């Protein structure tokens, strides 16, 4: 068996004890070739590197895609996609917490049980290890240092490639940290990882052809069977009620997806979002007006030329 080690700062370390069905030789996470109805014990070794006992909380989570287009393995309530049929959280069981004595290590067994029915594509998730907060620190109101690490788990049953596939779901107006935006939820509804994704979105009036707003993002990733909220910024302009159209183009791996969806912004919705939005900074009263600067320069040059001409004329009259 091979071992790979990841250090969570210097408080404790986690090692994945890679089994014989590990795919590849360089991965530091579990990347396993499995089969239907398979049962297997996976081991991780947690080493406490400090002089006091440490309690480590362990969670199993399915992978999800955050709204920045980054794949994460932490716990996120409400982010599990409706298209996810095989969830790592139901396949892999781990103790909720373990306490490691000072300056020692402990092997923690995890129980993996595959469903009887074969699955296609990739099951992706992770193990989250977090130092349990100090109760004294939390009750006193002090900010507790929390050491967190996510160890990836990848499961496949064959080399058959399942291509990713995208579609747009709900489109609506939202507040993005105090800034008005149009949010289009984009879903990857296949059990396939998506990398180097570029998405461009444009907003039009429902029957219009003029682009009102647009946003382009690149180098995004998506977990299998996940979704994320792609936001088109309104440049701090007030949101107007009415019927609009979202058009998007996504590109990855030589494939292209086109999206189109109409949506409504109600009067009250626009009023509420505008009231809560960060107001666009007004132009400064003393901002430079370049036209006035140019005009002033021409006046100065004209004045200099007039004075020079008068001196020249006086000089020649007196000669």
Task: Show which residues each predicted segment covers.
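Short, small-residue-biased leader/transition segments that mark boundaries at the very start
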Residues: 3-8
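C-terminal membrane-anchoring or membrane-association module
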Residues: 292-319
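Short, solvent-exposed loop/turn segments enriched in Ser/Thr/Gly
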Residues: 26, 37-43, 106-108, 120-126, ...
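Beta-sheet-dominated interaction scaffolds and their linkers
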Residues: 16-50, 54, 97-98, 165-177
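Short solvent-exposed strand-capping/beta-turn motif centered on an Asx-Ser/Thr pair
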Residues: 47-52, 63, 117, 187-193
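Membrane-proximal extracellular "stem/stalk" segments
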Residues: 156-292
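Terminal connector regions
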Residues: 52-79, 107, 113-160, 237-276
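Intrinsically disordered, low-complexity Pro/Gly/Ser/Thr-rich segments with frequent PxxP/GP/PP motifs
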Residues: 78-118, 204-239
């Amino acid at each position: 068996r091979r071992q790979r080690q990841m250090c969570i700062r210097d408080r404790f370390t986690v090692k994945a004890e890679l089994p014989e069905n590990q795919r590849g030789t360089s991965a530091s996470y579990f990347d396993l070739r499995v089969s239907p109805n398979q049962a297997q014990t996976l081991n991780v070794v947690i080493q406490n590197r400090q002089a006091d006992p440490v309690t480590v909380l362990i969670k199993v989570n399915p992978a999800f895609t955050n709204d920045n287009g980054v794949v994460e393995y932490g716990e996120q309530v409400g982010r599990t996609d409706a298209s996810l049929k095989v969830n790592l959280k139901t396949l892999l069981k781990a103790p909720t917490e373990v306490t490691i004595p000072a300056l020692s290590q402990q092997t923690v067994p995890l129980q993996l049980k595959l469903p009887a029915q074969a699955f296609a594509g990739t099951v992706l998730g992770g193990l989250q290890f977090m130092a349990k907060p100090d109760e004294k620190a939390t009750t006193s109101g002090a900010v507790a240092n929390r050491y967190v690490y996510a160890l990836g788990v990848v499961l496949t049953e064959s080399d058959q490639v399942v291509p990713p596939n995208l579609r747009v779901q709900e489109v609506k107006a939202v507040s993005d940290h105090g800034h008005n935006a149009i949010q289009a939820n984009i879903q990857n509804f296949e059990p396939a990882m998506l990398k180097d994704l570029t998405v461009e979105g444009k907003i039009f009036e429902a029957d219009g052809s003029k682009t009102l707003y647009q946003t382009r993002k690149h180098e995004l990733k998506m977990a299998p069977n996940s979704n994320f909220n792609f936001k088109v910024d309104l440049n701090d302009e007030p949101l107007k009620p009415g019927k609009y159209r979202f058009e998007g183009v996504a590109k990855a791996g030589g494939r292209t997806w086109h999206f189109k969806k109409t949506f409504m912004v109600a009067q009250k919705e626009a009023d509420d979002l505008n009231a809560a939005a960060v107001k666009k900074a007004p132009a400064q009263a003393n901002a430079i007006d370049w036209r006035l600067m140019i005009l002033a320069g021409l006046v100065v040059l004209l004045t200099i030329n007039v004075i020079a001409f008068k001196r020249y004329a006086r000089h020649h009259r007196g000669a």
